[in-house]
């Protein structure tokens, strides 16, 4: 893929969703773009957006900056697709972060890309690496690390992590720390640790490592993955899903109204 090809992909596949730049790409197109990024060797960040992250990007200027400068922002949530469709901005494919990670690891095994897993609880990233190397023969996981709680406030620990990543020789970094911590870590450090592609992957390491049970595929396909997570931890997640996330509909109505006034709907 040439620079010209890259610009065509980006310019033709970008949509504005509630003021958030989304790349309207299939998983296969993302994989192909990643190949280009690895060959280019300029550090980039790839992130996904669900309702919770969309609200953070809308309401927090720094998060908006991070997502606006990301190489790819993919849609990781059925509600985002439903709202975008009603705004006459149909999204061609929901790209689930955990599913994308598996596809990326499959391709990494085929193309001899090296990966590094950062995040999750003690031992989880190790188990995830073991499972991935078993499922994708030839995959090279060159390192795993689970940072201690509060690592981002410890300069020595941060220096240790960045040095570890820089010396790893990895082509891709999968970070599972939850948002916004994982997004901020990548954004502020990727140029220093100099790994071509870094991904904010949330709970993907937990799913692959087996520490958290993922929702059945039928629930994910029908936009009910959030409900599965809620049933696993209702006390902690009730406010998030039934109070905080409801604010997305306010922003949706405001955006839709402004688009109608501008004659774009």
Predicted regions and their residues:
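N-terminal nucleotide/polyanion-binding subdomain common to many enzyme families
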Residues: 2-99
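Conserved acidic residues
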Residues: 71, 142, 171, 196
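A transmembrane-helix-recognition feature enriched in membrane-embedded lipid enzymes
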Residues: 79-84, 215-265
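Short gly/pro/ser/thr-enriched loop/turn and capping motifs at secondary-structure boundaries
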Residues: 80-82, 181, 204-209
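Conserved beta-alpha
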Residues: 85-168
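Short Gly/Thr/Asp-enriched flexible loops that form oxyanion-binding sites at enzyme active sites
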Residues: 129, 183-192
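Short, flexible loop segments at boundaries between secondary-structure elements
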Residues: 146-152, 196-232
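Proline-aspartate-enriched helix->loop->beta-strand connector
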Residues: 165-174, 179, 195
């Amino acid at each position: 893929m040439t620079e010209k090809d890259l610009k065509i992909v980006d310019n033709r596949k970008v949509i504005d969703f509630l003021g958030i730049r989304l790349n309207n790409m299939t998983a296969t197109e993302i994989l192909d773009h990643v190949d280009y990024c690895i060959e280019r060797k300029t550090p980039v960040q790839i992130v996904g957006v669900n309702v919770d992250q969309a609200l953070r990007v809308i309401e927090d200027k720094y998060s908006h900056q991070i997502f606006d400068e990301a190489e790819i922002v993919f849609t990781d949530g059925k509600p985002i697709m439903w709202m975008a469709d009603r705004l006459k901005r149909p999204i061609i494919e929901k790209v689930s972060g955990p599913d994308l990670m598996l596809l990326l690891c499959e391709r990494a095994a085929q193309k001899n890309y090296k990966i590094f897993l950062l995040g999750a609880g003690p031992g989880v990233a190790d188990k995830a690496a073991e499972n991935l190397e078993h499922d994708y023969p030839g995959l090279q996981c060159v390192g795993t690390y689970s940072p201690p709680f509060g690592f981002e406030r410890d300069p020595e620990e941060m220096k240790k992590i960045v040095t570890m990543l820089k010396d790893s020789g990895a082509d891709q970094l999968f970070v599972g720390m939850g948002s916004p911590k994982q997004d901020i870590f990548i954004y502020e450090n990727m140029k220093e640790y100099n790994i071509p592609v870094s991904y904010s992957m949330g709970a993907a390491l937990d799913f692959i490592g087996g520490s958290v049970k993922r929702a059945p595929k039928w629930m994910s396909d029908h936009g009910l993955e959030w409900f599965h997570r809620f049933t696993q931890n209702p006390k902690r997640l009730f406010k998030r899903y039934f109070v905080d996330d409801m604010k997305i509909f306010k922003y949706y109505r405001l955006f839709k109204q402004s688009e109608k006034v501008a004659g774009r709907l």
